[in-house]
């Protein structure tokens, strides 16, 4: 009988909650057609047509240390790679199939290279693993709403042995948990329709993973993928509930809590443009300004932010993505202490931006000027020890202007005769409360 241990849960989640910011990497054969990671499904591509990318795969500029260094410079503390996506192509040396990177012209165990590079730079290591597999002959084809051959009767499922597929899938997860050292996150994807929970033999799978990697943390996608928060949030956790909810491209309005009011931890995953995998015609990139504010929003609500890149067919981060990561990194080098180890504050969201908190330190993320002195709703001036601007450490005094004399129980900060914000995206002030 499974029993949820809140203390153990908090222990294994601590590093994750301190980190707050991570990189997602979607990379595989689909970078060659350059039409996104779902290209085989969206175009209902025959396996023979897709296999030509397998025979071609030889990224001439492949170097995972460049991905890792870009993540580190952007201020990210963990990094997750797609060890296998829905197309079934394995970026690791597996004994279960020849559809793997070591059998391509590249001839490299990409997961091995990646995990080594990440640890060398001090980043926590995560692996994404797709529960579904469009390459395996025993995974449902005809009628499955995701499979490339879903509309072709000649691919009827008679004779397919789903249990044999599950044995294959479990064996691959065992390899990932055995052959690559300490894995900090296993990011499963995804569940839909009746393909969820024990359909994956999920209790058995999670037991194996936790036995091989006792301190690993798991997402909730053995249960659900964006359709509900899962059993932990519902207050009756299953043995395969996972450790964090994984909303995709949406930030929960108020964070996530179970029925008892205890926090359920979560991580928003988001693309930098419109696709996860490389798409050569997708030039709609989110600005660094927007992404910094989304990171702050996640932390101010008690969540993490996992930002994706999709390297091209040569293994190179697209220039626009690389530039955006550099911009984010410049912000994080100055203001990282307002993100790492921080969480939501009991102080209501202010009109001028957001607040993150770590102990008795409040970080005021000021996005825009106010009409007069900066109002600090919910904070009494007598409770404030100091206010400092993170960019240069200068003191920000409290305002004593007559204009707010009608609000004696609320503090106001004086940004000076020229209140121009030093960072047009987010000027961060550290307000320290008296102990």
Sequence positions of predicted segments:
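Mature catalytic domains of secreted/periplasmic carbohydrate-active enzymes
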Residues: 1-435
């Amino acid at each position: 009988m499974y029993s949820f241990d809140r203390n153990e849960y908090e222990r294994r989640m601590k590093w994750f909650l301190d980190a707050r910011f991570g990189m997602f990497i979607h990379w595989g054969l689909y970078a060659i057609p350059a039409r996104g990671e779902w290209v085989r499904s969206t175009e209902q591509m025959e396996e023979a047509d897709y296999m030509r990318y397998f025979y071609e795969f030889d990224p001439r500029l492949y170097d995972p240390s460049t991905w890792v260094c870009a993540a580190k410079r952007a201020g990210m503390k963990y990094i997750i790679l797609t060890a296998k996506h829905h197309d079934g192509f394995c970026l690791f040396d597996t004994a279960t199939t020849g559809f793997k990177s070591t059998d391509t012209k590249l001839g490299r165990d990409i997961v091995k290279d990646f995990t080594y590079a990440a640890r060398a730079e001090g980043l926590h290591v995560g692996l994404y693993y797709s529960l579904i597999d469009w390459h395996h002959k025993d995974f449902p084809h005809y009628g499955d709403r995701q499979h490339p051959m879903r509309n072709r009767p000649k691919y009827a499922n008679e004779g397919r042995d789903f249990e044999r597929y599950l044995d294959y899938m479990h064996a691959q997860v065992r390899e990932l948990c055995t052959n690559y050292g300490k894995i900090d996150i296993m990011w499963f994807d995804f569940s839909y329709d009746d393909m969820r929970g024990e359909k994956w033999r999920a209790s058995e799978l999670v037991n194996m993973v936790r036995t091989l990697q006792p301190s690993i943390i798991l997402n909730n996608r053995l249960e659900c993928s964006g359709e509900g928060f899962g059993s932990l949030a519902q207050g009756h956790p299953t043995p395969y509930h996972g450790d964090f909810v994984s909303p995709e491209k949406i930030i929960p309005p108020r964070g996530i809590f179970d029925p008892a009011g205890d926090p359920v931890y979560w991580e928003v995953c988001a693309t930098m443009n419109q696709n996860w995998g490389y798409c050569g015609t997708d030039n709609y990139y989110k600005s660094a300004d927007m992404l910094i504010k989304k990171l702050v929003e996640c932390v101010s609500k008690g969540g993490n932010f996992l930002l994706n890149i999709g390297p091209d067919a040569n293994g190179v981060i697209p220039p626009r993505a690389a530039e955006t990561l550099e911009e984010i990194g410049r912000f994080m080098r100055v203001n990282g202490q307002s993100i790492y180890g921080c969480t939501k504050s009991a102080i209501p969201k202010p009109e001028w931006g957001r607040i993150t908190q770590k102990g008795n330190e409040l970080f005021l993320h000021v996005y825009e000027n106010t009409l007069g002195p900066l109002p600090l709703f919910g904070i009494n001036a007598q409770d404030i020890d100091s206010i400092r601007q993170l960019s240069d450490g200068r003191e920000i005094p409290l305002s004593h202007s007559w204009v707010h004399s009608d609000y004696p129980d609320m503090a106001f900060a004086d940004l000076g005769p020229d209140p121009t914000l030093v960072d047009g995206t987010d000027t961060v002030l550290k307000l320290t409360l008296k102990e």
